[in-house]
Amino acid sequence: MVDTHKLADDVLQLLDNRIEDNYRVCVILVGSPGSGKSTIAEELCQIINEKYHTFLSEHPNVIEVNDRLKPMVNLVDSLKTLQPNKVAEMIENQGLFKDHVEDVNFQPVKYSALTSNNEECTAVVARGGTANAIRIAAVDNPVNVNKLAQDSINIAQIVPMDGFHLSRRCLDLFKDPQTAHKRRGSPSTFDSNNFLQLCKILAKTSLCKVSSHHKFYSTSSVFEKLSKTFSQTIPDIFVPGFNHALKDPTPDQYCISKFTRIVILEGLYLLYDQENWKKIYKTLADTGALLVYKIDIDYEATEERVAKRHLQSGLVTTIAEGREKFRSNDLLNGRDIDNHLIKVDNIVHIRND
């Protein structure tokens, strides 16, 4: 079993080490289907946030949110703006770029939009269209810390790769839609274009620095340091999740807020050495604030886990069908991950049998 408390300590130590140079740190957590990566990511996130809530309960009124950010960055200034007529055309086509659904070289574009909470934002879309959109909220109204419940302030946030599954209507437009649906979960059935763009955005925010008029000492805790270095000018970033009942992405399910100092990215292909996936590691590693974990587990153990999950999700009607679905798709994806793992030295391998 994975010691998630030890992982939490390692992540907080990285944040402490990098807090003068990085606004946030990232964690990559990769594993084959059924390896337990989602559960581990959720536990890790919960442990870190609970530790911070305990600190806040013992240190009331410690949080400061200031605007001393260096450098001031436009997170998507390099992206082309999608013109209104093209936005209308995309929406008319069910939020898709019909000619680009399989184009892994399609460059993400941006346009003005609204979040699901009706906040003004910049939407970033790629070959998966609006189903896999990233939405960056406008930075307008200053945060009033006094009006925030302290247990609502979370410094860690998970970002599952699942939200970047191409929608079923997107797969319908593939040259071979039958195979695309059958092999859903393989690398080509995710919007790798926009997930890489998300990593580029996160890297830019990571490299921002917030100065503080407080003098920190060697005895200052990491929670004390980060509590004095929240920034008003870091925007909220909304990313999609995945609804297993609807079998499609759901917009704005996760929010990487200005309080998020640890982003835990989990998924199958974040260390994959092909197409857009191969650029993710370097994009985040170049910030100097990244931890990378690969979960190793025997396929015999994952078969039963995944078969039961398929049955519970309604994808199959019997456990035997679940096992067959695992062998014809999930097992192939797991082996693909192992065969195409990027070759870098700092991947920490952990067992979860």
From Swiss-Prot:
<keyword id="KW-0547">Nucleotide-binding</keyword>
<dbReference type="GO" id="GO:0016301">
    <property type="term" value="F:kinase activity"/>
</dbReference>
<dbReference type="GO" id="GO:0016887">
    <property type="term" value="F:ATP hydrolysis activity"/>
</dbReference>
<keyword id="KW-0418">Kinase</keyword>
<dbReference type="GO" id="GO:0005737">
    <property type="term" value="C:cytoplasm"/>
</dbReference>
<keyword id="KW-0067">ATP-binding</keyword>
<comment type="function">
    <text>ATP-dependent kinase that could be involved in endoplasmic reticulum membrane assembly.</text>
</comment>
<keyword id="KW-0808">Transferase</keyword>
<protein>
    <recommendedName>
        <fullName>ATP-dependent kinase YFH7</fullName>
        <ecNumber>2.7.1.-</ecNumber>
    </recommendedName>
</protein>
<dbReference type="InterPro" id="IPR027417">
    <property type="entry name" value="P-loop_NTPase"/>
</dbReference>
<dbReference type="GO" id="GO:0005524">
    <property type="term" value="F:ATP binding"/>
</dbReference>
<feature type="binding site">
    <location>
        <begin position="31"/>
        <end position="39"/>
    </location>
    <ligand>
        <name>ATP</name>
    </ligand>
</feature>
<comment type="similarity">
    <text>Belongs to the YFH7 family.</text>
</comment>
